Amino acid sequence: LLKVINSEIMIYNHSFIGDKTDYLSKDYFGMSACGGEIKGDKLSAFNIGDSNILVLDKFYNILYRTKDDIRLLSNIREEEIRKRVPYITDSIDEHWNNDKEFRVWFRKEYINTDNEFAYGSLNGNEKALEHINYYEWYVKNAKYILAYTGGFEEVLKNENNIVKLIKAKKFKPKINGTLIGFIKE
């Protein structure tokens, strides 16, 4: 299924920008993703990029959490970037927002590559499939399964926030994010 999704994204990208990207104005559309299927007491799941899954029991204890390659490697990646790009001495984010050459270099170096600090994005590139993480979890004791994007990462580190979200109280992350919940009966 993920191969099909990834190839459909490539067809979309080719129809809009052609066969070549400049990693800037003609950059490929890409996305992070997560999903899964429950059969019996087993959840088969996957994630790529900063889309994640959190599995909780009825007391809101974390049973399982997917690996967020973007966040996990971000500090190491920043150190590596500072070594390789000497003119960066301040925030990487500042350069991302204001330095086109840096954005081009970063995308070529760190998205869907063999670089040990790279992360995946479903953008049609075959390499994206190598960055997908797969999981098999026993979920007999699971009650809540949350699928979310990076905007909710910090929110979901706090148990009180998790309880508020599950009980459908109003809660807004500091940055944009998507949250989908499932209650297992």
Positions of PLM-derived features:
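PP2C/PPM-type serine/threonine phosphatase catalytic domain
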Residues: 1-185
